């Protein structure tokens, strides 16, 4: 059987790169969403936004679509930036600076990353999973790897930020890796059923 086309519902190069590494062993052809394709994220949770994106891209392309909505929730900030993580400011650097400034008056630096994944075919949702990683917000950026808030998110018990980890380590303990651990058996089952 030929590889199954699967469109990644994202224009984020960092996410696309991680998806490609995480799904490297699957009989799928990973495609990116059409250039300039914009989806309004109107959900109130990460999963609702992942669902909206997966359905929209699947309907637009006629292929299976995999969407991720993920972000950072900081306890002292009432869960902010949450679903607005990527829209918190206009660049990664500005987002980090804003978050560190808002967190300055607080001693509680607990945070968690969440990743919601959804695979859709047309308007039908086929798979939904979520993964998490608990940690703390550092006082200043540390590390050169990763993207987004990675330089200020220190994983609980490890003493390293995501940006200080190599891809393999982040894949095994990070929120996206944890979500993919749940997705992979379901994706294998889905692909197996498509062969019949």
From Swiss-Prot:
List of residues binding Mg(2+): 40, 69
Annotated substrate binding sites: 10-15, 70, 147-150, 170, 175-176
Cofactor(s) in the UniProt record: Mg(2+)
Any GO CC annotation of this UniProt entry: cytosol
Molecular-function annotations in GO: dITP diphosphatase activity; ITP diphosphatase activity; metal ion binding; nucleotide binding; ribonucleoside triphosphate phosphatase activity; XTP diphosphatase activity
Cofactor-binding details, from the entry: Binds 1 Mg(2+) ion per subunit.
Function, in words: Pyrophosphatase that catalyzes the hydrolysis of nucleoside triphosphates to their monophosphate derivatives, with a high preference for the non-canonical purine nucleotides XTP (xanthosine triphosphate), dITP (deoxyinosine triphosphate) and ITP. Seems to function as a house-cleaning enzyme that removes non-canonical purine nucleotides from the nucleotide pool, thus preventing their incorporation into DNA/RNA and avoiding chromosomal lesions.
PANTHER family: INOSINE TRIPHOSPHATE PYROPHOSPHATASE (PTHR11067:SF9), INOSINE TRIPHOSPHATE PYROPHOSPHATASE/HAM1 PROTEIN (PTHR11067)
Complex formation: Homodimer.
Family in the record: Belongs to the HAM1 NTPase family.
Official protein name in the record: dITP/XTP pyrophosphatase
Species the sequence originates in: Prochlorococcus marinus (strain NATL2A)
